[in-house]
């Protein structure tokens, strides 16, 4: 099993608190008799991964897993577009662009906005590691990626376990990306 959450250094307090909650609660998943009426379903800690972010303090994101999502990028954009309040109400408001999306705005324009947000958030992966990605994912467009950092509070998975959790992903070796980090 796996949990994906934000790192505890995120800009949004809900993200930070969720991260802390995951870390605090994850251990209790394997503690016997914590909730007598709900015995643990397993004695194994889940793998906990942090989703990519661009924050540098107090610690830069460490890419452990790289996943090329070129083939499913459009599906991701469409799925995220269903999160109406975040992507079409408050996010545009925070950057003083609340008039860009109205109730009458068509789906294509909405999807374009979501794509812009995703490119802003995840674009640095393909920009910063472009040369490396050509080697890691030969024959791919190498435009759209997700990256994950394995959280030290969860299970520390073997490569064979990661391959099951992230089919087709590239798993970095310690220090492998250091020369690309700015």
Language-model regions, residue ranges each:
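Active-site beta-strand->loop->alpha-helix modules in alpha/beta enzyme cores, enriched
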Residues: 1-35, 42-44, 50, 61, ...
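C-terminal accessory domains and tails appended to enzymatic cores
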Residues: 35-44, 55-59, 64-182
């Amino acid at each position: 099993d796996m949990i994906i959450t934000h790192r505890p250094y995120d800009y949004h307090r809900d993200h930070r608190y969720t991260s802390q909650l995951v870390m605090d609660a994850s251990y209790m998943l394997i503690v016997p008799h914590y909730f007598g009426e709900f015995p643990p379903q397993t004695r194994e800690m889940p793998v906990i991964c942090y989703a990519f972010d661009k924050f540098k303090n107090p610690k830069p994101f460490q890419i452990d897993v790289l996943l090329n999502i070129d083939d499913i990028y459009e599906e991701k954009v469409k799925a995220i577009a269903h999160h109406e309040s975040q992507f079409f109400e408050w996010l545009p408001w925070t950057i003083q662009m609340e008039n860009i999306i109205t109730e009458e705005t068509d789906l294509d324009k909405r999807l374009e906005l979501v794509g812009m947000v995703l490119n802003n958030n995840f674009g640095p992966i393909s920009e910063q590691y472009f040369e490396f990605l050509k080697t890691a994912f030969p024959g791919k467009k190498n435009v759209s990626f997700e990256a994950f950092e394995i959280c030290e509070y969860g299970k520390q998975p073997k490569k064979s376990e990661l391959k099951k959790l992230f089919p087709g992903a590239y798993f970095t070796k310690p220090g492998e990306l250091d020369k690309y980090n700015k």
